[in-house]
Amino acid sequence: MILTSVLGSGPRSGSSLWPLLGSSLSLRVRSTSATDTHHVELARERSKTVTSFYNQSAIDVVAEKPSVRLTPTMMLYSGRSQDGSHLLKSGRYLQQELPVRIAHRIKGFRSLPFIIGCNPTILHVHELYIRAFQKLTDFPPIKDQADEAQYCQLVRQLLDDHKDVVTLLAEGLRESRKHIEDEKLVRYFLDKTLTSRLGIRMLATHHLALHEDKPDFVGIICTRLSPKKIIEKWVDFARRLCEHKYGNAPRVRINGHVAARFPFIPMPLDYILPELLKNAMRATMESHLDTPYNVPDVVITIANNDVDLIIRISDRGGGIAHKDLDRVMDYHFTTAEASTQDPRISPLFGHLDMHSGGQSGPMHGFGFGLPTSRAYAEYLGGSLQLQSLQGIGTDVYLRLRHIDGREESFRI
């Protein structure tokens, strides 16, 4: 039974569902003080969300529309105009596209089994999407630059509102783990939700970045990206985490096409590389606990060709056990021992939204890292594959398609 079939078309007096939904769908207002005035406004907004939760007709209509995905080449060569008309064109595209993509994801939440969909954390994320849909569809058509500037403010707000969605989904599904009977359904839901989120954030961030005049960039697209430099940035990040946890970190050697430069979008690399590097360093340190200050290097090889970019990360961390190899790409599987660390205090996925900066955090956690990285790579027309020699180490191959237009590319 799915969530919508149980919820029906609207709340009824005395319905037993209200206690189940709990505090996420209720807010008491007791006074008219300055603080409570804010609570009144929040209550009104959440009341609208609840109404929309039960009145899905507008969402259903939009969810039937197909998504219009752009190639990076289209984004790169859309050009700039002195009068700012490119910003209006981009803003109008977003205004049409974002509600469609969000409606598709709301439909995905409604397809979840009832017991999972009613988990308070999952329900909170569902509510975030409904609220975003409301705000986007309530915004009047963009007619001029003043409208576009207001729309940018809304987009920034929504990006901030949704910055913790990955962590919340991981937490909610971990809480619901014992109720999951169909692993394939959950994997499909997560693949779709996480890659859709990546696409939305790329498009939204690209539009905001079009307002900036940054050398070698058109929006979020770097016209002369150096794989070596972006790898070095995340090597430094991963080594700091590793040193904080283990007191030392493996050295990293980078070889191959180290001088390569080409147009590319750094954002997916900023999402995937930290996870792969943390895995390699953790495996290396934990397989050499007797000699923590004498550990083998992690070796990264860059291979650039006319079709794609390949990054191989090789470690001597003992490899992956045969019994685990088929499961490492499954959501919520992790080779790390269970930890009592509260994920809300130190979220594993902070780096996915570029908010971790230099802070230290856990070297392992929910078991979302590899499957999320795989989903992102496949969404971008590439792949993520592992070759493991148990007792020796692991090679991870990240393959991403070029965006220069010479070969067929992916769509965002």
Swiss-Prot record:
Mg(2+) binds at N279. GO terms for molecular function: [3-methyl-2-oxobutanoate dehydrogenase (acetyl-transferring)] kinase activity; ATP binding; protein kinase activity; protein serine kinase activity; protein serine/threonine kinase activity; protein serine/threonine phosphatase activity; pyruvate dehydrogenase (acetyl-transferring) kinase activity. GO terms for biological process: branched-chain amino acid catabolic process; isoleucine catabolic process; L-leucine catabolic process; lipid biosynthetic process; regulation of acetyl-CoA biosynthetic process from pyruvate; regulation of glucose metabolic process; spermatogenesis; valine catabolic process. InterPro entries: AK/P_DHK_N_sf, BCDHK/PDK_N, BCKD/PDK, HATPase_C_sf, His_kinase_dom, Sig_transdc_His_kin-like_C. PROSITE patterns: HIS_KIN (PS50109). It catalyses: L-seryl-[3-methyl-2-oxobutanoate dehydrogenase] + ATP = O-phospho-L-seryl-[3-methyl-2-oxobutanoate dehydrogenase] + ADP + H(+); L-seryl-[protein] + ATP = O-phospho-L-seryl-[protein] + ADP + H(+). It comes from the Eukaryota. Autophosphorylated. Serine/threonine-protein kinase component of macronutrients metabolism. Forms a functional kinase and phosphatase pair with PPM1K, serving as a metabolic regulatory node that coordinates branched-chain amino acids (BCAAs) with glucose and lipid metabolism via two distinct phosphoprotein targets: mitochondrial BCKDHA subunit of the branched-chain alpha-ketoacid dehydrogenase (BCKDH) complex and cytosolic ACLY, a lipogenic enzyme of Krebs cycle. Belongs to the PDK/BCKDK protein kinase family. PANTHER family: [3-METHYL-2-OXOBUTANOATE DEHYDROGENASE [LIPOAMIDE]] KINASE, MITOCHONDRIAL (PTHR11947:SF20), PYRUVATE DEHYDROGENASE KINASE (PTHR11947). This is Branched-chain alpha-ketoacid dehydrogenase kinase.
